[in-house]
Amino acid sequence: MTSPLTLSQRALALKTDSTLTLNTQGQLGVSLTPGDGLVLNTNGLSINADPQTLAFNNSGALEVNLDPDGPWSKTATGIDLRLDPTTLEVDNWELGVKLDPDEAIDSGPDGLCLNLDETLLLATNSTSGKTELGVHLNTSGPITADDQGIDLDVDPNTMQVNTGPSGGMLAVKLKSGGGLTADPDGISVTATVAPPSISATAPLTYTSGTIALTTDTQTMQVNSNQLAVKLKTGGGLTADADGISVSVAPTPTISASPPLTYTNGQIGLSIGDQSLQVSSGQLQVKLKSQGGIQQSTQGLGVAVDQTLKIVSNTLEVNTDPSGPLTSGNNGLSLAAVTPLAVSSAGVTLNYQSPLTVTSNSLGLSIAAPLQAGAQGLTVNTMEPLSASAQGIQLHYGQGFQVVAGTLQLLTNPPIVVSSRGFTLLYTPAFTVSNNMLGLNVDGTDCVAISSAGLQIRKEAPLYVTSGSTPALALKYSSDFTITNGALALANSGGGGSSTPEVATYHCGDNLLESYDIFASLPNTNAAKVAAYCRLAAAGGVVSGTIQVTSYAGRWPKVGNSVTDGIKFAIVVSPPMDKDPRSNLSQWLGATVFPAGATTALFSPNPYGSLNTITTLPSIASDWYVPESNLVTYTKIHFKPTGSQQLQLASGELVVAAAKSPVQTTKYELIYLGFTLKQNSSGTNFFDPNASSDLSFLTPPIPFTYLGYYQ
């Protein structure tokens, strides 16, 4: 006979590795890891895929299911998000609005914003409550703004706005008949003095920005900055504190015309009390303290700040040469660069989709999956996608992992993933023909393949039973008996067989080379370990040892072993030959000696205590129970070893009697919970960047408990 069939001392046997298993009915099957995405149904082995997110294409390959009407697309390098290149871009793995760096629109932590200089500002409209763009005005200056536009506040008593060829013109308000006139040369005082021997016209002049009083040098003079009538010595006129008087008779007749007056022998000047005044005997223009007109030794002028200037005796708005405001023949204008534009209606923003303007506010027209909120632009996501401050995140469960930003499927041998897809690793006992996996059968051996399936060539005393489930059977006489599935000589003593008082039980791989034992982890994940358990029952007391090893490539990359430890649990099920569902850790068939011993001898004893059995969770792949939740247990300390980088310090094993809701027999199970502790400078066993060859090994850990007996 050749591999994989062997002939042992008792029967024909089929050798398998960890990818195949034999059930209690002796049927060959594929060994599957619960929760790894592979399921076995009536049609054969298949991948259990979520139909909403995963699908099989026409070639039978597994791919991500994408909505054809959505923004996602498939490329040769993976899944991509289709973007409008004119408005959206991806920068450093983040989706954002594409902005022209030369334009006034910018982005910040709160969203899109406008870059403004000191002449513009953003303010909240007290009526609508919306933020609006406006011109920045000095609150202490005369320039104001309302719903009609920018305005210049003036003193209505001294200033007025006249209509000019290109719009309004600021001018000094002159009272009709007030003694002041204006012409292209400026403001002047008009006065007619007509005494019998004196006549004067236009005594006021305005030259080079200075108001002066032109006097007749023969009749008027200025003494100590005071205007006075020039009296000729011996001319018949005298002057004293009371005024001018004629010193000769008869008194001449003196008359005066406005703005000059003559009363009781005194000549006076009638002035408007709102625009002129006499101070210290001098005629002056009356200036309002905040009226915008100032007086100096050079004369009367307009007071201006940095926003106004006087050029060629003309008041102009002072604009920044590097700013957007300019002045010309048509008045003040605002220069704008794209996307801003200036028209008769005001400053407008040129925009195109997806930008919109609603109720005088700039907005962004968006479509699903984007939405706008108080915090800015966000992306609506559906499971398994979610959005956070760090970006869009893909949530994935068991069977997936993310390496270097790429979603990958986790596989366990014999399935591996390469750049070409999934690959099934198989031993020479298998072959692939026409893309189908089959057994590699030696035609000269006792196993043959026909159109009906796999067949075994047999000779007496072997035969195949009839019925709905045919099986290979052995014909034997009454001199033999079958005990625990093994052929044995019938008891010739006539008294019948009895359960041995001493028996041994062992399961697993004593060489610790087969990583096929299922271990449950605290974080709802699972791992594969190699383990060997040996039990010895004598007089109702069971003594056992358990040894476990594994390496990082068999574990999910979740958590921090340096701070939390390497924690896992396995379950030993002595009654698994009668109750396969109780075999939570998926041990291969156990060996019991002697052949007549019952496996019940090795189950924990439920008698003699009350409520000491811990009930495990009913989830097939998640039955880890923390130490604090165990009803009662025994704790054993041990010293593990392993890779130097891990710096393993100590280990603990808790042993507890347990039951699983999925088991069908009454016998208890043995719950073994492990905790491996590291020094603080050790390497995290779960670090995705750590070597997958990091490993640990426990010593054979002894434990004892009371066995099942009555």
From Swiss-Prot:
Gene Ontology biological process terms in this record: adhesion receptor-mediated virion attachment to host cell; symbiont entry into host cell
Subcellular location: Virion; Host nucleus
GO annotations of cellular component type: host cell nucleus; viral capsid
Keyword flag Transferase: no
Gene3D superfamilies: 6.20.10.20, Fiber protein 1, C-terminal domain, reovirus attachment protein sigma1, domain 1
Keywords: Capsid protein, Host nucleus, Host-virus interaction, Late protein, Viral attachment to host adhesion receptor, Viral attachment to host cell, Virion, Virus entry into host cell
Induction of the gene: Expressed in the late phase of the viral replicative cycle.
SUPFAM superfamilies assigned to the protein according to its UniProt record, in alphabetical order: Fibre shaft of virus attachment proteins
Keyword Transport carried by entry: no
Xref: InterPro entries: Adenobir_fibre_prot_rpt/shaft, AdHead_fibreRBD, Attachment_protein_shaft_sf, Avian_adenovirus_fibre_N, Fiber_prot_C_sf
Family of this protein: Belongs to the adenoviridae fiber family.
Role of this protein: Forms spikes that protrude from each vertex of the icosahedral capsid. Interacts with host receptor to provide virion initial attachment to target cell. Fiber proteins are shed during virus entry, when virus is still at the cell surface.
Domain description: The tail region anchors the fiber to penton base capsomers, whereas the shaft, built from several repeated motifs, allows the knob to protrude from the virion.
Miscellaneous note of the record: All late proteins expressed from the major late promoter are produced by alternative splicing and alternative polyadenylation of the same gene giving rise to non-overlapping ORFs. A leader sequence is present in the N-terminus of all these mRNAs and is recognized by the viral shutoff protein to provide expression although conventional translation via ribosome scanning from the cap has been shut off in the host cell.
Quaternary state and interactors: Homotrimer. Interacts (via N-terminal tail region) with pentons.
This protein's name: Fiber protein 1
Species name: Fowl adenovirus A serotype 1 (strain CELO / Phelps) (FAdV-1)
Upper lineage: Viruses, Varidnaviria, Bamfordvirae, Preplasmiviricota, Tectiliviricetes
